[in-house]
Amino acid sequence: GALSNGALTLGDASYKFNDGHFSGTVNAANFNTTSDATLKTNVETLTGSLDAVKSLRGVSFDWLENGNSEVGVIAQEVEAVLPDVVSTNAEGIKSVKYGNMVAVLIEAMKEQQLRIEALELKLGE
């Protein structure tokens, strides 16, 4: 419900808000994503992340709905490379889980760093 300070609450600690759609901008100090090891199984380090990132395209675009300019990626293009970071709703509209892409970027950066260090060693010889 609405609070006196203008904030909006959705349920309470026992209520879990699973799905939602917001058109426009949502501002918050932080969005926390549950990531506790005790809630996970079959944990494996990602491989091939650098190749995946290299095949992605960052784009600028205007939203059809309101004409606002943005930058981002195209969900269909991401889905072709990283299907686990794309969701499709009941109407067939695709969404990118940008937060989940961080793990891919971390591993891609580590792969790139290994390549840089190997080249530095060659140059030092």
Q: For the regions a protein language model found, what residue spans apply to each?
A:
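C-terminal intramolecular chaperone/autoprocessing and neck/assembly modules of extracellular spikes
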Residues: 1-98, 115-125
